[in-house]
Regions:
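Conserved glycine-rich cofactor-binding loop
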Residues: 9, 14-17, 40
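Alpha-helical segment proximal to the catalytic Tyr-Lys
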Residues: 128, 171-175, 239
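Substrate-binding pocket helix/loop in short-chain dehydrogenase/reductase
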Residues: 71, 99-112, 210
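C-terminal helical subdomain
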Residues: 182, 204-237, 241, 248-250
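Active-site helix of classical SDR
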Residues: 123, 158, 166
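Short C-terminal tail/terminal secondary-structure segment
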Residues: 147, 231, 242-262
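Residue(s) in the substrate-gating loop at a strand-loop-helix junction
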Residues: 142
Length: 262
C-alpha cells in the first residue's frame, strides 16, 4: 500500500533509538523525509546514515528536549531546511522511576520536562507549519497512564497528560484539518528495555513473567509494529481518524486478566 508520504517532512523526537528509530526508518521506506531529533548527534547521524542507505533523505538535529529553547530550535531547523512540516511524532521520554515515596518536587518537575512538556512545546512551535500542510501529530504514550505500575508517579502523570493532550489537540485543531492521535505502548522490545531487564537479578525469569501477561502470542511488541501504526496514522490513509488512543500492545491493557498464564 502506498501511504502517499513521499517527500513529506516528519519531525521525530527520540529518533535515534528504539521506537523512534523504527519510525524514522519506516518513514524513509515510504519516501518521507524524517527530521531525526535526539540529544546525541552521533546517534542521530547513525540513523541518518541508515536512511541514506535506503536511498532516502533525512536531517539530524541535536536537541535536549527538556530545555524549552532546544524544542524551538529543533522545529526552526526543520523549517530552515525544508520550509515545511507535514507531521510530528512526539516520542522522546524515559520511565525514570520518580515515585511518590522515592521522588521529590525537583525530580517530579524534571521528569515532566523530560516526558511531557516537550510534547506540548514541539507541537506549539510546529503549529503554524502543520496548519499550512494540514498535517498530522502522533503522540507515543504508555500503559502507565492507564494501568498504574508503582513507583513511577511522574512518568504515569506524563503519559496521562499525553493522552489528554491528544484529545484536547484533536478538538482544538479540527478547524485546520490537523489530525492528532496517540499510540499506547505496553511492553515493547527496545535496546533501552533490554538494558533495564539486564539490571535485574533474574532477567530471563522476569522477562518470561512479563511476556506471559501479554495475551497475543505471549511476546513483546516490536518497535517495527509501533512504527507501522505510526506511519499509517501520519498518512492520508487514516484521513478520518483523530483523537484516538490506539493500543499496540498485544491486548495487554484491555483483555481479560483470566488470559494470563499461571
Amino acid at each position: 500500500m502506498d501511504l502517499n508520504l513521499k517527500d513529506k517532512v516528519v519531525v521525530v523526537t527520540g529518533g535515534a533509538k528504539g521506537i523512534g528509530r523504527a519510525i524514522v526508518l519506516a518513514l524513509a521506506k515510504e519516501g518521507a523525509i524524517p527530521v531525526i531529533v535526539g540529544r546525541k548527534q552521533a546517534d542521530n547521524n547513525l540513523v541518518k546514515a541508515e536512511v541514506e542507505e535506503l536511498g532516502g533523505k533525512a536531517i539530524a538535529v541535536e536537541a535536549e528536549l527538556s530545555k524549552p529553547e532546544d524544542c524551538k530550535q529543533a522545529i526552526q531547523k526543520a523549517l530552515d531546511t525544508f520550509g515545511r512540516i507535514d507531521g510530528l511524532v512526539n516520542n522522546a521520554g524515559q520511565n525514570d522511576g520518580v515515585g511518590l515515596a522515592s521522588g521529590s518536587y525537583e525530580g517530579f518537575v524534571a521528569s515532566l520536562h523530560k516526558n511531557l512538556i516537550h510534547y506540548y512545546l514541539m507541537a506549539h512551535h510546529a503549529l503554524d507549519a502543520l496548519k499550512a500542510s494540514k498535517g498530522s501529530i502522533v503522540n507515543i504514550s504508555s500503559k502507565t497512564g492507564e494501568t498504574g505500575q508503582g513507583n513511577t508517579s511522574a512518568y504515569a502523570a506524563s503519559n496521562g497528560g499525553r493522552n489528554a493532550l491528544t484529545r484536547e489537540w484533536a478538538v482544538e485543531l479540527l478547524p485546520y484539518s490537523i489530525r492528532v492521535n496517540a499510540i499506547v505502548v505496553a511492553e515493547c522490545a527496545t535496546p533501552q528495555y533490554d538494558s533495564w531487564i539486564q539490571t535485574l537479578d533474574n532477567p530471563e525469569e522476569t522477562l518470561k513473567k512479563i511476556t506471559d501477561r501479554i495475551p497475543l502470542e505471549n511476546r513483546m511488541t516490536t518497535a517495527e509494529e509501533i512504527a507501522n501504526t505510526a506511519v499509517f496514522l501520519l498518512s492520508d490513509k487514516s484521513s478520518h481518524t483523530t483523537g484516538q488512543l490506539v493500543y499496540v500492545d498485544g491486548g495487554y491493557v484491555h483483555l481479560d486478566r483470566s488470559l494470563i498464564k499461571e
